[in-house]
Amino acid sequence: MLLPLAPSSTRRATRAARGMSAGWCAWSAGDASLMFSLVVRPDVNMHAFHGLPFVAAMGMMDVLAGTAATPGLGLAGKVGIQWPSDIVCGAPAFETSLARVAVNGGAGAAGMFGAVTVDIERSALSELGVDMADEALVEALAAAVLTRVGAWAVAANTPQGAAGPLAPVLGEYFDMVPLLGRQVAAVSPTVCRSRWRVCGLDIWGRATIKTDAGEQEFPPEAVRIRGL
C-alpha cells in the first residue's frame, strides 16, 4: 500500500510502522528528493536484523541495475552500493550520492519490524537519464526491497544463514560494491580524512580496510567511506 507522506514526517512514519503490516509504504516527493519509508517484517532472529540495511540496498540495485531475470532501469555499471547501504553513481569514481538507505528496527504488538527509509537525489536521477513517474519508481523500488528481504529471510533461517546475517548473500553483495579493492576517502572518529583501501567484507557486514597501521576491521558505524 502506497500512502502520501509529508516531507518532514519520516520519524512519525517510523513510529507508525509499529502497527503496520509488511509492505506498508509511505512516500513524499520534493523538488530535490524523492523519499519513501517501507515496513518489512522478516521472520529472522534479532541478530539477523543487522543485515537489513545491506539487503535493502541490494533490493534497490535489483531495480536500478537489473537482475538476471529483468534489466531493471538498465543502469548496470553506472550505479553501485557504497558500503554499507547507500547507493552511488558517477562511474568510475562512484562519488555521487544517488540514494541514502537506512533501516530503523523496533518491536510492537505485531512483533519485530524494520522501517526502511530511502531518500533519492533527483539531480542524480537526472544525470542517469531516469525518466519515470515518482509513484511508479517508488512502487518498483519498494516491491524489490520487499522481495529481497523476503528471500533473504528464508536463507537466513538455514544453516548457512546461522553463520551470520550476510552469509547467504555476501558474494552477491560483494559484486554490487564497486569501491572494493580501491582507494577511498575514509572518515572515522579518530581520523578526520585519510586515503585507505577497502580489502574485503565479512558475514557481519564489517569492512576490512588497509590503513597506515595495517589491515583493520571496522563496523559500519565506525567509519564512512566514499569514492575518490
PLM region descriptions:
Residues 2-6, 44-78, 89-228:
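Long, positively charged amphipathic alpha-helical accessory segments at protein N-termini or as interdomain linkers
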Residues 1-26:
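Flexible, acidic active-site loops/lids enriched in D/E/S/T/G that coordinate Mg2+ and/or position polar
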Residues 11-13, 37, 82, 113-119:
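Short beta-strand segments
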Residues 85-87:
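RNase III-family endoribonuclease catalytic core
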Residues 9-10, 25, 34, 207, ...:
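A broad, low-specificity signal marking well-ordered, structured residues that form hydrophobic/aromatic
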